[in-house]
Amino acid sequence: MVKVIASSVRKGNVLDVDGKLYVVLTAQNFHPGKGTPVTQVDMRRIVDGVKVSERWRTTEQVERAFVEDVNFQYLYEDGEGFHFMNPANYDQVVVSQETMGDQKAYLQEGMTCILSIHEGIPLALELPRHVTLEIVETEPVVKGQTASSSYKPAMLSNGIRTSVPPHIDAGTRVVIATEDNSYVERAKD
């Protein structure tokens, strides 16, 4: 276990709070005009999946559990969960639906992800920062819109909605940021 200050806690970190392991879902630092800055952390207890919320002063010490981050390749999904393979030694692990959360929409066969493993158990998954997806539906362009500041809604091939520039049409492959579902650029393939 490593002690770190609360303000350095990030999404995906594994914390040891009162002898129980938690995966950080969100971590935000608040600096009110009056009073001490605090870090608001939403976490999921690994043992039973219960979500909890904690608030610490930013200078408070919290314990981070030792977690190994390993590259794994996504294989497939079945009733058991999501199957990943370590390309270095061909070991396979199954990640549960709860651990995967809403990130499953971005999984593509053969995609390399980083799994956080603690004592042989996959705790959290980190997707690549950007993925390439196809636009399946967009609204038509309204004449007179400027290309600089206006975006139009679009539906991606994985079912997620995003906003794209007016020149992007259905069938176009685009690069999307996995963290906030935002448009990055037109795919270069």
UniProtKB/Swiss-Prot annotation:
Pfam families: EFP (PF01132), EFP_N (PF08207), Elong-fact-P_C (PF09285). GO terms for molecular function: translation elongation factor activity. Transmembrane segments: none annotated. Keywords: Cytoplasm, Elongation factor, Protein biosynthesis. PANTHER family: ELONGATION FACTOR P (PTHR30053), TRANSLATION ELONGATION FACTOR KOW-LIKE DOMAIN-CONTAINING PROTEIN (PTHR30053:SF14). Pathway: Protein biosynthesis; polypeptide chain elongation. The gene is efp. Belongs to the elongation factor P family. It is found in: Cytoplasm. It comes from Rhizobium etli (strain CIAT 652). This is Elongation factor P. GO terms for cellular component: cytoplasm. GO terms for biological process: peptide biosynthetic process. Disulfide bonds: none annotated. Its main location: cytoplasm. Involved in peptide bond synthesis. Stimulates efficient translation and peptide-bond synthesis on native or reconstituted 70S ribosomes in vitro. Probably functions indirectly by altering the affinity of the ribosome for aminoacyl-tRNA, thus increasing their reactivity as acceptors for peptidyl transferase. InterPro entries: Elong-fact-P_C, NA-bd_OB-fold, Rib_uL2_dom2, Transl_elong_fac_P/YeiP, Transl_elong_KOW-like, Transl_elong_P/YeiP_cen, Transl_elong_P/YeiP_CS, Transl_elongation_fac_P.
